[in-house]
Amino acid sequence: MSEPARLISPEKRGEDLDITLRPQSLDEFTGQAEARANLKVFIEAAKNRGEALDHVLFVGPPGLGKTTLAQIMAKELGVNFRSTSGPVIAKAGDLAALLTNLEERDVLFIDEIHRLNPAVEEILYPAMEDFQLDLIIGEGPAARSVKIDLSKFTLVAATTRLGLLTTPLRDRFGIPVRLSFYTVEELELIVRRGARLMNLPITEEGAREIARRARGTPRIAGRLLRRVRDFAEVARAEAVTREIADEALTRLLVDNVGFDQLDKRYLNMIAVNFGGGPVGIETIAAGLSEPRDAIEDIIEPYMIQQGFIQRTPRGRVLTAIAWKHLGMQPPKDMEAAQFRLFQEDN
């Protein structure tokens, strides 16, 4: 059964849109130091030349700050910010309406650009390259091509699946930026900043406990902080301590590494039903009754980054870390079998 309301899902929810908790500048933004440093240079150079910033593509798992960075870029460039997403732009007319309303150097943000309609994508190419729209007006013998000049704008796009972008689209982004999961130390700073903006007293240990369970994702850290605040207020606690954070998150079924029941079902299924793997993604999706995309985009990235599973051409394989987390003993021949598997695959 699908679980759209998972507390630790990195996907956006209404409560995550609290603009008061969002950083308003690159200096306020915590984490992604290399990306921020490069963006500062590109923004400053574009401002000095009085030109539109080159098109930017953010790549990375959900919840790492792609939308926030796009908004900050527009603010630091001193231009307007327009936002949409790939699935919303259903036809060429929708894209034309967006592009023709942009002013000089404005930022247009397209989230989930990998889900853009292929027919719309074709229209986007000349818009990005030549700042022109090539539209076909009418049908049949009466059809004619019309060129519309556009203001020089900056397209900032975000994707969780770089491999799903066509090569022509990918090549038109002059500034590719890959975002990675945050460290516990970075998330602790984010939690403490959020608590300060909420006027919520929190101890260093309390902030770290929330950060440890946030799966390397600021959006999840903010959501966990809100739920822990609820427990602290009802308990009339003077501050969020490690004990309060631990009790709240344990009651919410978020374990000490940030896994919930769905994550545990995933690991348990591979361990119990398939002896630790390898097992194919389609089999896992069927066993969990979850879409393949949700598993690849939401469940697996953090597990892979933390070393709980490995992706191989033959399927997913549990690591020793995963077996230890489950409190199970791996099959005696696991190491030898996995060694043979990796040797054959290489």
Curated annotation (Swiss-Prot):
SMART domains: AAA. InterPro entries: AAA+_ATPase, AAA_lid_4, CbxX/CfxQ, DNA_helicase_Holl-junc_RuvB, P-loop_NTPase, RuvB-like_N, RuvB_C, WH-like_DNA-bd_sf. Residues 256-346 are annotated as: Head domain (RuvB-H). It catalyses: ATP + H2O = ADP + phosphate + H(+). Residues 183-253 are annotated as: Small ATPAse domain (RuvB-S). It is found in: Cytoplasm. The keyword ATP-binding applies. It comes from the Bacteria. ATP binds at L21, R22, G63, K66, T67, T68, E129, D130, F131, R172, Y182, R219. Its EC number is 3.6.4.-. DNA binds at R292, R311, R316. Mg(2+) binds at T67. GO terms for biological process: DNA recombination; DNA repair. The keyword Nucleotide-binding applies. GO terms for cellular component: cytoplasm; Holliday junction resolvase complex. It is an enzyme of class 3 (hydrolase). Pfam families: AAA_lid_4 (PF17864), RuvB_C (PF05491), RuvB_N (PF05496). Homohexamer. Forms an RuvA(8)-RuvB(12)-Holliday junction (HJ) complex. HJ DNA is sandwiched between 2 RuvA tetramers; dsDNA enters through RuvA and exits via RuvB. An RuvB hexamer assembles on each DNA strand where it exits the tetramer. Each RuvB hexamer is contacted by two RuvA subunits (via domain III) on 2 adjacent RuvB subunits; this complex drives branch migration. In the full resolvosome a probable DNA-RuvA(4)-RuvB(12)-RuvC(2) complex forms which resolves the HJ. Has 3 domains, the large (RuvB-L) and small ATPase (RuvB-S) domains and the C-terminal head (RuvB-H) domain. The head domain binds DNA, while the ATPase domains jointly bind ATP, ADP or are empty depending on the state of the subunit in the translocation cycle. During a single DNA translocation step the structure of each domain remains the same, but their relative positions change. NCBIfam families: PRK00080.1, ruvB. Belongs to the RuvB family. The RuvA-RuvB-RuvC complex processes Holliday junction (HJ) DNA during genetic recombination and DNA repair, while the RuvA-RuvB complex plays an important role in the rescue of blocked DNA replication forks via replication fork reversal (RFR). RuvA specifically binds to HJ cruciform DNA, conferring on it an open structure. The RuvB hexamer acts as an ATP-dependent pump, pulling dsDNA into and through the RuvAB complex. RuvB forms 2 homohexamers on either side of HJ DNA bound by 1 or 2 RuvA tetramers; 4 subunits per hexamer contact DNA at a time. This is Holliday junction branch migration complex subunit RuvB. The gene is ruvB.
